[in-house]
Each structure stands twice: as structure tokens, then as C-alpha cells.
Amino acid sequence: MPLAIFAQTQSKYIVVDQFGYLPESKKIAIIRDPQVGFDAAETFKPGKTYALVEAKTKKQVFKGKLTLWNEGKTDPSSGDKVWYFNFTNYKKEGTYYILDVEKRFKSYDFVIGANVYKEVLKQAFKTFYYQRDGFAKEAKYAGEGWADAASHMGKKQDPNCRQWGLENDASTEKDVHGGWYDAGDFNKYTNWTSDYIIYMLLAYEENPAAWTDDFGIPESGNKIPDVLDEVAFGLDYMLRLQFSSGSVISIVGEAEGSPPSSASEPSYWGSPSTSATLSAVAAFAYGAKVFKTINPSYSNKLLQAAKLSWDWAEANPNMKFYNNSAEHKTQGLGAGQQEVDDLGRFEKKMQAALRMYEATGEEKYITYFEQHYKETKMMSWSLVFPFGEYGQDMLLCYTKLPKAKPEIVKDIKAIYAVETDTINNLFAIKDHTDPYFAFQKDYVWGSNGTKAKQGNIYYNLVQYNVMPEIKDSARSIAESYIHYLHGVNPLSTCYLTNMYMFGGDKCTNQIYHGWFKNGSKKWDEATVSTFGPPPGFIAGGPNTEYNWDGCCPEGCGSKENNAMCFELDIKNLKNQPQQKSYMDFNQGWPLNSWAVSENSNSYQVQYLRLLSKFVK
């Protein structure tokens, strides 16, 4: 039932960014009437006049009429009929809400302010601190609720980790402590760890002003931007993965525990591979470039490591390692498959070559890049899409090089411009295909990460001066993807966990995570368990392909296991419109919530990159 507030009733049908809006940005509240999906029986008929109301004084500071989306048709992706209340022209800073003047329904409170997202950025960034492996979380940084001793530092764990398949061979022991739990699982995948480092460095370089030294981590106040401190934490871990030959370990499999320090099973490392080693080259070299003026000795250490690994990868171009594979006798090592295909390995070499050139200025690296750039996905497929961001962003970074060849820059930008203005990208935006202003074609596993990547696709038009004629609208489009993640969606849900202390009103309360797991009295669900998950984790998001395990409903091995299929009613999750294919839950097998609610550092870093563009 709605909550009555001073003769005004808070309504989930009046949807806003729960944190707020920048004064100069487009500001549109969405009014929704459900037509299709689990809430189709509900109804909301808005009044004729809406107002922006100052929360403290209850003064109506701006009034207007609603406009109807698409002549009142039902949007298939959300199952909703939608109206808009546009208050873009009101720019005075303060705390406000939207009011249906006639029917006395109101939205959540939100802020209009020049730095409305800074605290959100801090909390979302701090999730990497909570994901740190082998590092104590002190209460003064983590909060009393999430303080924990360093994890995976016991016998046969990270400090003396042994190779998978050679568990009884002490000669394989290697110190692999540090790095980050990858997602809701605690494994550490080198290919992906490198990506997180690259994207943190990229976010920093693209807008250094957003990345200050006061994000509340142990390194805060050391006169180095906290994002670079976090990068260094990741790079230090990757240096430990390197052998004297230059090869780099592909994966470290970790046991789970709640809290993580309670994990007691051994850790195992997987064999070096070409892809992992090239990933390390890119991270080391990019780090060497950025740290050159900040910490020259550290920069040189990274550069020497990068050169060593480059040479090994050149001599060993096709070394593969498949984890968690019955075929390769690695079942149980990690969860997701970190090995890449031939094209993925090629793009990793391209990234490594680009970053080595930036760090060294040596022509051999950029010559390789320029000779092969047309073989990348974007250039050879003529396609810009959110699942190709690694190569797309790499190519755009080339266009910023002082000595980039003008004809190659022109070629890259031309393809990016043409392929961004297609039916699944800008054309859909211009056609108002999604009434929630954040169109994406598919809602599958990790759709919230895809939203962030889609927003970054559009901000790249601004960042890399690809389509200067639409610079302002491209920025506004990118910002709309942030609003979606902050609550401008059919579920009126902020997809960041537990942000109630920082402006969130209806937040993600549960994620699938080995620490913040189902059944934990301390960390299961925000508002129910003692603490819930920490603030700022991005949940996976709507997934139209979600299903319970194939053993359900009657083949899970026992009556007790079969009963677990019905531990939670999932009818409101299945067979829904795309944007409603989500539920706030964190059950494990056989309900398999990880396909919907699990966090991932990959989602997080893409969101951080996008959000930081709107922070001063």
C-alpha cells in the first residue's frame, strides 16, 4: 500500500532518478500505467497538471502538463503506457519531488545539484575495496557491518597457492594474494582483472577531475587519486602472477565464505596462457604510462614487466588454458570461462601493442597496430555494439595519439559514426523506441552492465569528437542510461545496493554473492538482515533468458532439493516484458538467482566510467 505523506501519497508510478539531476541537464519524470506483465492488473491514471515541489517548503516551483508517449500505445519492452513531465528548464539547486496536483500523488524526493552524483560515485567505486582479496577491511573504512580480516591467507591458500592438478607438488607454490573477487564468486580471472584496470585508468584519463583522493579507502589522503590507488592494488596482484619467463597465470580459483575471511579451502592457480599474458602486458603498460609522473620507480617496474610478458607472448602466440572444463580436466577451477577465441586473443594483442607504444614510444608496437587495425571486430564487421566495447574503445584511444595517422583516425571515426547511427543505437533513440530513454536491444545476463556500456558508446561520441554536430544530445542520451540505473525504469528500482543513506529510496536489497548470501542473518537482505550488502553494488539486471535449474521441479535428486525449486515464487520473473524480467532475490541452486541479481566488477567498472563523466 502507498505511504501517506502530509495528504500526499507516494507513488511508484511517478518515476525519477532517485539521486537527482544536474541543473543544466534534461530532467523528465516518467508517469507509468502498467498494461502487460506481473503488474498488469494495477492501474494509474494521472491528473492533468503536474508540479515540481520544493521538499522543505512544499512550494510548487514549476508546473506543467503531461505529454503522452507514442499516442498512448503500450511499450512492448516495459509493458507500460507512459507520460512525461518535463521540468528541464528549472535549474535552481535544491531538494524536490514531483506532484500530481489533482490526485495528490508524489514521487520520491531527489536533488537538483551541480555535483549530485559525487557521493554515488564514491560508494559505487568503494565496492572494489569490499571485493579486495587478501586485504583486511577495517571498520573505519568498511563500516562496522562489513569489517573483516584478510581472506584467503591461510594454509594452502593465496600466499602459497599450488597449481591446479598438482595439489601435492609443493614446488608449484606461488604467492598470488591480492586482486579482487571477480563478482559474486570469489575467483580471480586475469583476463578480466586486466579489463578492470584498463577501464579504471581510462575513466581516470577521460575525466581526472572526478577522481579525487577522498573516497574513503585506506589509501585516501596520500595525494594520489584513489582510483589510481585501487589500480595499483590490482597491478601489484598481477605482478605476482608473472613468472620469470614473462608468462602470466590465467586464473586463481578461490573458496567462498561469509564473511570471506572464513573461507578455509585451498586456492589453486591455472596454467599461464597467451591471452592472460597479453592482458597483463596491456595493464602493466597502461599503468606504466599513467604512473610515470606520479611514481617513476613503480612505472619502470611495470614497464619492465610489460616488456618481459610481451616477449613471452610473441614466442608463445597460441597457449590456451580452459578452466572449469570437463573436457580439459579442470572442472571446479573457477566458474565462468575466461579463455578467449582467436579474435579475442588478437584484440588483446592489439590492446597490448597500443599500450606498449604509449608507454615506450617504440615504433614496432604502433606499426603492428596500424597494420592490423582493420581486422578488429568493429572494422571488419562494421559493427558498434555493447558487447564489442573492448576493441571499440581501444580503437578510439588510438585516435587521441599525437602521432596517429590522419587517414586511420578518419577511418575509425567514420565507422564508429556510421555504426552508432543504426537501428539498435542512435536510430532507436531518435525514434523514441524506449519510453524510458535507455534503449537496448536485448535484456540478457548482465543487462545493467550492458546499459552502462550502451551509455558509454554514446558518450564516446563526445569524448573522442566523433560526431561534434550532436555533442550535446549525445551527452544527454548517455546520461539517460544513468537515470535508468538510478530508478527511471518500469520497476522504479535503483539498481545499486543499499543506497538508502545516500539518497536512494527503492534500492536493490539482495545480490547473489558469496559474502552477502541468502540466509545470512547479517548480510542477506538490506532492510531485513542486520546489515545487508554494502552500498553501491550494481546488480545484474533484467534477464529474459532466466530460468530455474533444469532439474526443477521434480528432478533435483531428493524431495528436499525439489522443494527448493519452490522456496520462492518466480512467476513474476518469467515470461515478462524485457524491462520487468527482474526480481530482488539471491537464492542459489536450483533457483539460480545469479543470472539476474549477481554483481560483477565488469558491470561496476562500466558504470563508474559512465557516471564519472557527470561528476566534477
Task: Report each predicted region and the residues it spans.
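Proline-centered turn/helix-capping motifs that create local helix->coil transitions or kinks
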Residues: Q242-S250, P317-Y322, G361-K364
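Aromatic (Trp/Tyr) and acidic
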Residues: I14-R104, Y129-S194, I198, D236, ...
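Carboxylate/His-rich catalytic cores and anion/metal-binding grooves
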Residues: P225-S247
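Bacterial Sec-dependent N-terminal signal peptides
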Residues: M1-T9
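Hydrophobic, small-residue-rich alpha-helical packing segments that form membrane-like cores
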Residues: V281, K307-D311, A315-Y322, H328, ...
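Acidic, glycine-anchored loop motifs typical of Ca2+
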Residues: E219, K223
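Edge beta-strands of extracellular beta-sandwich domains
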Residues: F105-G113
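Solenoid-like repeat scaffolds
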Residues: K374-S382
